[in-house]
Design a protein with these regions (language model features):
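Adenosine-nucleotide cofactor-binding segment
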Residues: 92-95, 105-171
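Glycine-rich phosphate/adenylate-binding loop and adjacent beta-alpha elements
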Residues: 1-51
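A glycine-rich, Thr/Ser-enriched phosphate-binding loop motif common to dinucleotide/cofactor-binding enzymes
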Residues: 26-41, 59-80, 93-101
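Helix-to-beta-strand junctions that scaffold the AdoMet/dcAdoMet cofactor pocket
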Residues: 176
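A glycine-/small-residue-rich N-terminal strand-loop-strand element
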Residues: 1-2, 54-60
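Short helix-loop-beta connector
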Residues: 58-61, 83-89, 154-155
């Protein structure tokens, strides 16, 4: 817990060649070390055009910046990776930024039932406004899998763990 192994692996393999040489360089050919594959702490970055979206010039950058990570992670996990089908039953574990975006993705995909699960009633309220058809506060629910299986009529077609918890990942698998 607390060790993003895939991120650490990516940081080691996406920017550094096996020889230890760096993949990127500046205009003068000097090697550049980058973080997260594209220099996220840099003022400028070189990216593939497929990774870019145009935003309105008057869009607040504090809000627009969220779209590139949390929003796209949750939304695209549902629409691009899982390809949730219309009429599906979806369970989203965690109603933070990534989870709320997954809920929106499920609603846009046409899911028949979108169940948001969290321990915070405020977040669950937000989930309802963003497309959740049902909410479950799992705080103190030792039988959450049973609760979700009953609510979904036997299990979900898709389940998304949006917290980063091994225990919740197991729960996600168990509600399918």
């Amino acid at each position: 817990i607390g060790r993003p192994s895939l991120c650490e692996l990516g940081a080691r393999t996406l920017t550094t060649l096996p020889s230890g040489a760096l993949r990127t360089s500046d205009a003068q050919g000097r090697p550049l070390s980058v973080f997260s594959g594209c220099g996220v702490m840099a003022e400028y970055a070189t990216l593939d055009t497929r990774s870019l979206i145009k935003i309105a010039g008057d869009a607040p950058l504090r809000s627009a910046a969220l779209v590139g990570c949390g929003v796209m992670t949750g939304f695209c996990a549902v629409t691009n990776t899982a390809r949730v089908a219309p009429g599906a039953v979806v369970v989203v574990l965690g109603a933070g930024g990534v989870g709320l975006s997954a809920i929106q993705g499920a609603a846009v995909a046409g899911a028949r039932m979108v169940v948001a699960v969290d321990i915070d009633d405020f977040k669950l309220g937000l989930a309802k406004t963003l497309g959740a058809t049902h909410t479950v506060n799992s705080k103190g629910d030792d039988a959450i899998v049973k609760t979700l299986r009953k609510l979904t009529g036997g299990g979900a077609d898709y389940a998304f763990e949006c917290v980063g918890s091994g225990e919740l990942a197991a729960t996600a698998c168990s509600v399918l």
